[in-house]
Amino acid sequence: MKRLLIMIVRFYQKYISPLKPPTCRFEPTCSNYFIQALEKHGLLKGLFLGLRRVVRCNPLSKGGYDPVPEEFSFKLRRR
């Protein structure tokens, strides 16, 4: 299942993302973050981290450098 999600994100990166103007406010981009989170923390934790990041990426967000955390926690981080 983890591999399937990574394939879906890579499909998005290759075929859908180039058709849109760049809008991600973070570094690494949300799609790269999602893949890194899945690879580092596995399916459930990576999915949680990736979805949480996508929700945070909006016009009201300050954005900036936001790497995948080394340690996983369900606690929300304050910036």
From Swiss-Prot:
A GO CC term assigned to this protein in UniProt: plasma membrane
Keywords in alphabetical order: Cell inner membrane, Cell membrane, Membrane
Protein topology in the membrane: Peripheral membrane protein
Primary localization: membrane
Subcellular location: Cell inner membrane
Source superkingdom: Bacteria
InterPro entries xref list: Membr_insert_effic_factor_YidD
Function as written in the Swiss-Prot or TrEMBL entry: Could be involved in insertion of integral membrane proteins into the membrane.
PANTHER family in the cross-refs: MEMBRANE PROTEIN INSERTION EFFICIENCY FACTOR-RELATED (PTHR33383:SF1)
Family: Belongs to the UPF0161 family.
Entry protein name: Putative membrane protein insertion efficiency factor
The species this protein was found in: Thermotoga neapolitana (strain ATCC 49049 / DSM 4359 / NBRC 107923 / NS-E)
